[in-house]
């Protein structure tokens, strides 16, 4: 599987991902704007979360007035009792705008800097959709853009415009879809081991013992998470070359 162009050797659903979420960190290398692929995550999170995080895509929306701190619960800061911090976002973007102006020789405002990074993030999202649609012969203008995630509604219209799409589907619970999916997903523990040996009757006890050991490790992990022994099912798979 690949994540943001990086090949990962891990079990994964066939989903094309792009590093352009709300936590994607903003970079200026002296010549160009870049968004991601590294992320501030949820902790420390973007600068507006009041945990000392860097400027991220979410902060662009705060700077541009598309996220109003007054409409969010006071769950930010070290004690999770403060609202989003627009002041620190404005200060950081002002400093970044000065850096960009000094490097480019063209004076830009904090809002213009935020808008520039926003355009990069939207382009990254649109290009990811193009890769699995237009590049495979599909006309995306005939499809509906389905959005989810806490930041889905913030970027849906601009991504749709970039792709020439006319219709957007935004479910009322789109913001908690990932959490809902995790809540419904089976709890699993995966274990694997590579064994280089000839497949023969003599090797069977060793191979069976390895499977038993992996099963015990996986079962122990699930028991530690509070899963009842009666609810645990063990599946064994062997890939032979």
Residue ranges: model-predicted function:
Residues 1-241:
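N-terminally biased helix-coil "hinge/interface" segments that flank
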């Amino acid at each position: 599987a690949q994540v943001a162009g990086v090949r990962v050797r891990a079990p994964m659903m066939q989903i094309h991902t792009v590093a352009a979420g709300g936590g994607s960190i903003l970079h200026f290398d002296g010549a160009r704007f870049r968004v991601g692929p590294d992320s501030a995550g949820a902790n420390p999170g973007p600068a507006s979360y009041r945990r000392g995080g860097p400027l991220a895509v979410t902060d662009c929306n705060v700077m541009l007035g598309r996220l109003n701190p007054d409409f969010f619960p006071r769950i930010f800061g070290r004690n999770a009792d403060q609202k989003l911090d627009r002041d620190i976002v404005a200060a950081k973007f002002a400093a970044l705008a000065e850096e960009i102006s000094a490097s480019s020789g063209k004076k830009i405002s904090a809002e213009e800097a935020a808008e520039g990074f926003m355009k990069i993030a939207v382009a990254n999202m649109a290009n990811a959709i193009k890769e699995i649609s237009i590049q495979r012969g599909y006309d995306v203008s005939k499809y509906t853009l389905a959005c989810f995630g806490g930041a889905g509604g913030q970027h849906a219209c601009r991504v749709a415009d970039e792709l020439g799409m006319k219709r957007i589907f935004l479910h009322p619970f789109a913001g908690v879809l990932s959490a809902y999916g995790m809540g419904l997903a089976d709890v699993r523990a995966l274990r694997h081991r590579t064994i280089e040996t000839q497949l023969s009757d003599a090797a069977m006890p060793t191979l069976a013992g390895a499977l038993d050991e992996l099963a015990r490790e996986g079962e122990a992990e699930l028991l530690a998470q509070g899963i009842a022994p009666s609810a645990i099912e063990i599946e064994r798979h062997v890939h032979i070359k």
